[in-house]
Amino acid sequence: MSKTITKKVNKKTKKSTKINPKKLAKKPIIKSIDKPTNLTDVDFDKLIHTVETSTKRHFIAIEFNKKPVNNIANLGAKVNQKARLERSGEYYGIGVEILETIRPLLTNRLIIKILKLLKQENLTSPLKILDLNSLDELHYVLHCWLENATTVYDDCLNSYDKSYPEYDQWIRTVRSDPLNCKVRLTEIGFNEKTGGSVVPADWIDGEFDSGISLHKEMDKLETRIGKPPATYAIIHSMMIQKQDSIIEDITNTKFDYLFYVDLIDNKLVSKLVSKIRKKPYQYVKYDNTIIGFCLEDILTTKSQNNKKPREVGLYVSRLQKSIRRGRFGSQIMRETIDAINESPNYNLPEHGFMRVSASKQLVWRLFISILEDCRPYVTSGNELSLLDLILLVLITQKCLEYKFTDNLLELIKVTALMAQYNDTKSDLFDWRKFTESIKTPINPKSDYHTAISLALGNVIMMSGDTRMLKKLYSVNLVFKEFKRPKCNSLLELTSSNFKLTDQDTYQDIMLTSIDHHCKPNIILYYQACIPVSLTTREISSYIWKISSSYNIRSGKTQNNIDQVLRLVQNFLLEKSTKVSNEINNTFLNYSCNEIEPDNKTRRTSFLILFGSKYKFGGKDVMLAGTKKNPVKIKTKNEWVYSKDMAVINAYPKKYIYTKYLDPPFGFKWTKPKFWTEIIDGKPYVDGTNVDFFDGSIALKSITPLVTKKCNKYTTSLITTFFSGLDIELESILDVRNKSKPQIVNWVNTIDLNDIDLELVRCTYTKIFNQFNNTIMIGPCDRSGNKMHNSINYKLEGKLWAIFNLLHYLYPKTINPNSALNFSLNRSTQGYIHLIKSLEQLLFVGKNITGLVPTISTKLWDHQQETVNTMVAKFTDGYHGFGDASDVGSGKTLTSLALASKLINTINDIHSGILVLLPGNKLIVTWQDEIDKHTKNFDVKLHKPSGDIGKIKRNTIVISTMGRQRDNPINHKWLLVIIDECLSVQNKNALQTEQAFIQSLLAKYLVMMSATFFRTRFDKLYYMLKMLQTGLPERKQYLETILAESIVAKVPLSGMKWTTNIIHFQLNSLTRELYNKIIDKDLSVEAKYAKLNSLLVNNKEVNNMVVKQLSKLIAELTKQGCKCLIYARSQDEAKLWSNNLKIPIYPKKGDHCIVTYHDGTYGLNDLVIYNTIVMRPPTPDSLPQIKGRLARPGQKNNNLRIEYFVLEDTIEEGLLIRLEIASKFVHQYIMPLAKFYNISVNHQKYK
């Protein structure tokens, strides 16, 4: 919501402006045009220069060749206009129809135009252009825009009498903001990051109240689970689309080429002419080319009952296969052409899901298939020429809501059937041997070259088609007529003249047209059935080679039929993958083991019910402490334990809805919602008093007592599915559509030697690595590449088969909910039994013995405290921890000490330590730390080749994310350590998937980063999931999760930091400039931007800083300080270096200058310095900056930071923000609006 812009009344005496009343006569609706103004005092040239040189980036109009582009921001939009997002990225191509008028946004270009008109004393035009009613409104709009959109405006247009808040949102809106009007979706767009559509095809024609409401609906899509909110799809930078309407009159239209298409005596005649014909024609235009046609002769509107989606992609594939297989496919050719022509418009996947006419695709793919799979030709009868075909393509590309008339459709059939009929070796033109033409102009002397030129210049096509047409254009041969079947007429053919057909060819075309181009899921279904061998990419190539590509004209024998592939094709042809989710009513519920909740279960369930943050006295509060001190209060930026009754009683009583909150493992919620409250300092659930940190009253044990053994059939079925060998498609479909009436114990009946444990691992991981309890298999695109999520290229299809099996075994737990995906219910007995069964398979083995490593270096107190905390939590059943201690606090040594402790105390089947690094740079650091501080570790480097040999009890493997992705190590680790864990934020990356697998199968996990959560919550979400806290990974539980699973220590001994603040002074001139901005009536955000610009860019300020910095360095030198001085930029570093005679890193001297960019991360050779001199940095960078000095090799225990700030300026606000960044629990970024406020107004941060 935009803020109301307020304005102080200017008390200066207003001077009247001479206005010519004649200039005002054209706009009688203006209320206040004759009011006196002070425009004569305005220096418009200066104001225009201000806009030209100091407009903020988002308020600058987008131009091309010095002309404004046709986007909504520049032009606005009228009702029924269509707009499309043409910016590359995840929302590319999404389009809408505008249902309410939108004003053009106020950009630098528009404001300059208004100012130039005012300079000419033209007052009427600005009011008309901006649709304003008075000069007072104009002053308000201009003044407020200049205040907010520029950095050096001098308040010269502040003479308005009152505020007009109804214009505030318009004034502040920029091109990246969502449209605030009703829209109708017209294009589903193409997600260039995933290869899928932006929104589903069935959203077409859906109406939304605004861009924001459409974005909110997008956020609910399965493909956006775990992703940041949609914000930049339906926005003002969308391009206004030209209306592809038919033109009735071209008398005054410029063109270079004019074609006419006529249907005369049952034959289509296309000609390039020089003069416009007088007969009534309709026209479509492409740049310098116009095509005339009689609409009623060639096109007719599609019937309204034709809206049911048809699989046009499948029909187009069938059209191509019909031509490739030759003359005995005439029957299916006719049927296919009829089906395509009758189909509604659809979204073309290979062209970014662009909305296209099915009739256009009919003639376009016919044109391409004839050239690619047959040969160019000249006509000899009533068949269409290549020029006829491409002109029909261009007409239907503009006229989307039409289909071909029956007469013209008959000619299209004849043309396709003639190409199909010409199926000998001599009918396959070898276009591949030709060279691509660089230029492809229209050639009036050659219809053939003209057709190809029109195609290349005006049709969006696949790159392979482009290359083919450019090669074909270079051909200068005399082409032959098509051979014709015998008929009574020498010239005219009908489709009925093509009578050759046989059932085998018909069936072959019907099935081979179902391939990876139109049905990408076929890749995963095929992979599900064959032994583990081919990746999805290899299967894509295989299907093309074995099934799709065969052309009878090659003279080669058709490949033997792959029976597995044929069965999958039959399945896709005849059966829907949708199944009934009705569960067998006779399914048995088992009696349960009444398992007593352990401490972790009790605490977790309580935190789910009571643990979300609330407010008391303006402070953040959590019921996440200890039994003695149950509440945590955020006081002075630090969480403090308390038992204050007033704070505890302030808990807001409320319902907790548990329907979508997963219970602790082994239990289910007894109800879908619970009433929680605190009465007299005691927690109550549904009116019953419970102990602090024991929410087990809301839980019911669901661990089933299963005694029934698995029969031989089911054992054989499970073994087959998990073996990695052949699975019959019929078996997969059978288990998909059936369910066992009861849970059976199946693990002990199968032989581990007969199953592929990698499939078990991947199945186990899929169950945990899901969002909103939806298990997603694939999808992949037609080339076998991933789309929305990371996939296992070798096993993804097998996983689809296995989850169908699990649905059969646990029908109340896993259910198919789409062609590939499955829903998961974790509050069932089946879920508990399934997880325990998989774990029984995975975690088998003998207890580990062997050498135990030791730590040879004494730990700092905070390191020992961290180790003790983690070990205690691990003992209580926790899986993962995050170590967010400061840079230089020794996190590496802490993790090694933890590893040694765990190895010493645990000797079960888990063994070895895996260290995952983001890249190669940290490998040497880890090797050095192990050598310096430990004994008896068996250190192994995971080399790119993969194998690391035997993993012993004391083995520590150092690997990188990339190596783990390419050559994963399958092992049950005792501990996985992920250093710089921000590298596993992207859930769609395969390396993140592998990191998740390693951590899930490990007994324990530690994730390390001093800037652990410096990121958006959607990125944080995946790392929280890896920790497996048992708490909901939702924003309202964020602080609770952190309190439970993050340690953040600052060394309490050893190196100590002393911080001093030196105040530099502004001189009188710069102080006056500063105060002038302070006095402006601006939002604090805009004011901060202007003040910052002054302090950064003003030369007088920069020179003054250099002088005072020189004195500071001289004084510090006398005190024995060796200074590392941080500059904002390279330019500032050079300025300081030249004036202070101090080298810039990597050169070093008694002092050294480094930029924030170069000197924040990774530099380990600066420990010769003991003092940091800098302006207050951002909280994100401070820990890393301090870590350049406070690290091994530093000989000084007393280190210093000398902050220099300009007194009574916004730089003091930076100091206040740093107060909340000394420890991790303080390191949440201050809300930006609050930061601006404290910086500008010097308020104390609360």
Curated annotation (Swiss-Prot):
Binding positions for ATP per the UniProt entry: S885, D886, V887, G888, S889, G890, K891, T892
Superkingdom of origin: Viruses
SMART domains: DEXDc
Annotated Helicase ATP-binding domain residues: 872-1030
The keyword Acetylation is assigned to this record: no
An annotated Gene Ontology molecular function: helicase activity
Keywords, ordered alphabetically: ATP-binding, Helicase, Hydrolase, Nucleotide-binding
Entry-linked Pfam families: ResIII
InterPro entries: Helicase/UvrB_N (IPR006935), Helicase_ATP-bd (IPR014001), P-loop_NTPase (IPR027417), SNF2_RAD54_helicase_repair (IPR050496)
Signal sequence annotation: none
Span list, region Disordered: 1-21
EC number: 3.6.4.-
Protein name listed in UniProt: Putative helicase L115
